[in-house]
Amino acid sequence: MLTDEYRYKILNVLQQDPNISQRELAKRLGVSLGKTNFCLRSLIEKGLIKAENFKNNSNKVKYLYLLTPKGIEEKISLTQCFLKRKLKEHEELEKEIERLRKEVSDTK
């Protein structure tokens, strides 16, 4: 299953580096090549990315992964969700830090 986290990470990497290989993408994500292939196929089926063939310098056929307009909208939506979640985590962490500081100062 393709989680929001992986969907976000993949869309983000592909937007920055559309000619990345599946092997390099798998390495950046810290997942297997098979899982990366599965995720890319899923994103293509959902219309979030498209893959185009091109030849690189050594005459090997490679893919160029491009975000579709729908993919760009999805990335924006996911970014907003992650930002909201991270801000909440940040607030909770600040509260915990303050509680720990108070605990330490109370024991002195």
Locate each region found by the language model.
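Amphipathic alpha-helical dimerization/coiled-coil segments
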Residues: 73-108
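Alpha-helical residues within the helix-turn-helix
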Residues: 27, 45
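Pre-recognition alpha-helix immediately N-terminal to the DNA-recognition helix
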Residues: 8-12
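Short, cationic-aromatic polyanion-contact patches
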Residues: 1-6, 21, 52-75
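Short helix-capping/hinge SLiMs at alpha-helix to coil transitions
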Residues: 14-17
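Key DNA-contact positions within bacterial/archaeal DNA-binding proteins
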Residues: 23, 34, 38
